[in-house]
């Protein structure tokens, strides 16, 4: 449940209506995060740009959506955000994730057969970032560099905070 009310489609704010129009056009829908942020549409606009670049593969064209979703879901789980876990689990399911796969992300993903070595490296990096332990685990970046380009590592890092 949001702490602020969601801005509705019938809002009097022309700026919020334009923001919603952009979301529908670029993302296919208006997320609850945007509905809350629409109280300040000018501040919300860059968030939409980030969401588009992070979630639409045809925009960045660099990192597979599956890897992005794994990273986003791991971060949600580590933060203990039930809403985020539910929302991002649905994203995973829409990409074909099995329930066991979703469960494995929160457990011992490193020994799971669900994930490739590259995916494990991305999930581990997200874990190190979220828990602020990346300096204690230099091997996490070394593993990433085995499988991903610098541009892909930037995307993994950015969606870890999504």
Positions of PLM-derived features:
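Mobile cap/lid helix-loop segments that border enzyme active or cofactor-binding sites
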Residues: 1-62
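Iron-sulfur (Fe-S) cluster-binding segments and ferredoxin-like electron-carrier domains
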Residues: 44, 86-104
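Immediate flanking context of iron-sulfur cluster ligation sites
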Residues: 61-78, 154-155
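Helix N-cap / loop-to-helix initiation motif
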Residues: 64, 98, 149-150
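Short cysteine clusters
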Residues: 81-84
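Short Fe-S-cluster ligation motifs
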Residues: 107-132
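Amphipathic alpha-helical interface segments
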Residues: 125-128, 140-148, 152-153
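Preference for long, well-ordered alpha-helical segments
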Residues: 150-162
């Amino acid at each position: 449940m949001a702490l602020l009310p969601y801005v509705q489609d019938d809002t009097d704010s022309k700026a919020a209506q334009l923001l919603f129009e952009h979301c529908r056009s670029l993302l296919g829908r208006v997320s609850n995060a945007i509905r809350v942020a629409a109280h300040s549409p000018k501040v919300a606009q860059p968030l939409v740009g980030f969401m588009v670049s992070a979630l639409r593969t045809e925009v960045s064209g660099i990192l597979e959506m599956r890897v992005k979703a794994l990273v986003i879901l791991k971060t949600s789980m580590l933060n203990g955000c039930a809403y985020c876990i539910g929302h991002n689990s649905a994203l995973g399911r829409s990409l074909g994730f099995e329930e066991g796969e979703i469960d494995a992300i929160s457990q011992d993903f490193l020994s799971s057969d669900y994930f490739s070595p590259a995916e494990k490296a991305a999930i581990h990096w997200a874990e190190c970032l979220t828990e602020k332990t990346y300096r204690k685990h230099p091997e996490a970046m070394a593993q990433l560099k085995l499988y991903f380009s610098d541009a892909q590592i930037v995307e993994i890092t950015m969606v870890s905070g999504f």
